[in-house]
């Protein structure tokens, strides 16, 4: 029983980090699973939307869809698609910031990429 729990724990990695972007404190929570990645981005503890993206052998652009939340807000799906392309994994993204300005979103994405370069084993 303990061996199977240890093996299961080795397949899951949790990583949390925060950044102050444009005077807003943004929190990032990453859960790396065996073949997938879950990323939550937000300032308050809410899960307002969820998107998923994954690579396909039929198209170089990863397929993506919104699982729940406001489908007119494509921030989560776009970020999931770009991260799926970068990691070659199935990526779930929940982007829960009210500021969806493209410049701010780019700052958020750059902070994620910076963290990926610093801690590749967490992604």
Swiss-Prot record:
Keyword terms of this UniProt record: Chaperone
Cellular component annotations (GO), alphabetically ordered: cytosol; protein-containing complex
Single biological process term from Gene Ontology: proteasome assembly
InterPro entries assigned: PAC4
Functional description taken from the UniProt entry: Chaperone protein which promotes assembly of the 20S proteasome.
Family: Belongs to the PSMG4 family.
Record PANTHER family: PROTEASOME ASSEMBLY CHAPERONE 4
Protein name according to UniProt: Proteasome assembly chaperone 4
């Amino acid at each position: 029983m303990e061996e199977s729990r240890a093996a299961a724990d080795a397949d899951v990695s949790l990583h949390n980090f925060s950044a102050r972007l444009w005077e807003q404190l943004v929190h990032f929570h990453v859960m790396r699973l065996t073949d997938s990645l879950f990323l939550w981005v937000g300032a308050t503890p809410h899960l307002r939307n969820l998107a998923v993206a994954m690579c396909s052998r039929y198209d170089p652009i990863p397929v993506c869809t919104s699982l729940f939340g406001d489908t007119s807000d494509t921030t989560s799906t776009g970020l999931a698609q770009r991260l799926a392309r970068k990691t070659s994994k199935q990526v779930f993204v929940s982007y829960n910031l009210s500021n969806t300005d493209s410049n701010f979103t780019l700052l958020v994405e750059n902070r994620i990429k910076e963290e990926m370069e610093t801690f590749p084993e967490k992604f």
